[in-house]
UniProtKB/Swiss-Prot annotation:
Its EC number is 2.4.2.17. One of its GO terms (cellular component) is cytoplasm. This is ATP phosphoribosyltransferase. It is found in: Cytoplasm. Pathway: Amino-acid biosynthesis; L-histidine biosynthesis; L-histidine from 5-phospho-alpha-D-ribose 1-diphosphate: step 1/9.
Length: 211
């Protein structure tokens, strides 16, 4: 078996994904005791892992540094990459939502200002609804933007809604459901087809058996 390099997202999604790889027999002990390391070799296999920021997973896969990647659907929607999206892993499930302070009127005809970390997704969503909005990109906590009057509403990923609630915001619209996706480099799918599909097929069966 030729070596397969898998790019994973650091943080919350990583904790959801590691158990899936363990369930299909891939050793992830180094990943679970990583310290500050970012590159790991799975014991007794030709599989290695790299840990990078979510937005970089698709970039590493697109350019062939990683053969396989696991990343949230939000990253793929916001950043168009030349990769294959192969499998919905069904973990890390969240929703894109429009949220604001209780006095926000989503049916108002005046042009709205929307704060978000995801301008591409937000622009497409409101364009499809036929609404003209001004989008302000915020890199930090977007929840404060409507509270301070910078914008009318925000678009953000909501998992439990606790952060919104703590800041006095409510969800006005649920836009899209998102989850972790397995992606593959296009060239690698030709040159390492058997190795890649051996992982994808077993992973898919594991997911289906767990439903």
């Amino acid at each position: 078996m030729r070596n397969i390099q898998i790019a994973l997202t650091k943080g919350r999604l990583e904790k959801h994904v590691i158990p899936l790889f363990e369930q299909i027999g891939i050793d992830c002990s180094e990943l679970k005791n990583k310290g500050r390391k970012l590159v790991f070799q799975s014991k007794n296999t030709d599989i290695s892992f790299i840990l990078v920021k979510a937005v970089d997973v698709a970039t590493y896969v697109e350019h062939g540094v990683a053969d396989i990647g696991v990343v949230g659907k939000d990253v793929l929607m916001e950043n168009e990459k030349d990769i294959y999206e192969m499998l919905d892993l069904g973990v890390g499930v969240c929703k894109f939502c429009v949220a604001s302070i209780p006095t926000y009127n989503p049916k108002s005809y005046r042009k709205k200002r929307i704060a978000t970390k995801y301008p591409h997704i937000t622009s497409n969503y409101f364009h499809d609804k036929g609404e003209d909005v001004e989008i302000i990109k915020i890199e930090g906590s977007v929840e404060i933007a409507p509270i301070l009057g910078l914008v009318d509403a925000i678009v953000d990923i909501v998992e439990t809604g606790k952060t919104l609630q703590e800041n006095g915001l409510i969800v006005f619209e649920e836009m899209y459901s998102i989850s972790a996706r397995m992606i593959v480099n296009k060239a690698a799918l030709k040159t390492k087809k058997d190795e890649i599909f051996s992982i994808i097929n077993v992973m898919e069966q594991e997911i289906l058996s767990g439903k």
